[in-house]
């Protein structure tokens, strides 16, 4: 009986997907504090920085499924821990 109960608990945990959900920063400011909870399939935080002509460097932050490739005049930083895309 105990074995059956233990098996049911394990199956319930696997089926419910009680996994970890990543949180990333999502604002363009340098001192960004706005946090976003990523979707289950998004396991990476991204910060894309690019030159905005005479306005200086700008950044985009958010969640991603995979780390994007950098475009010309752009840097991309990817990480996989909470709020790591500062």
UniProtKB/Swiss-Prot annotation:
InterPro entries: Snake_3FTx, Snake_toxin-like_sf, Snake_toxin_con_site, Toxin_cobra-type. The keyword rRNA processing does not apply. Disulfide bonds join 24-45, 27-32, 38-63, 67-78, 79-84. Keywords: Acetylcholine receptor inhibiting toxin, Disulfide bond, Ion channel impairing toxin, Neurotoxin, Postsynaptic neurotoxin, Secreted, Signal, Toxin. Expressed by the venom gland. Belongs to the three-finger toxin family. Ancestral subfamily. Orphan group II sub-subfamily. This is Weak toxin 2.
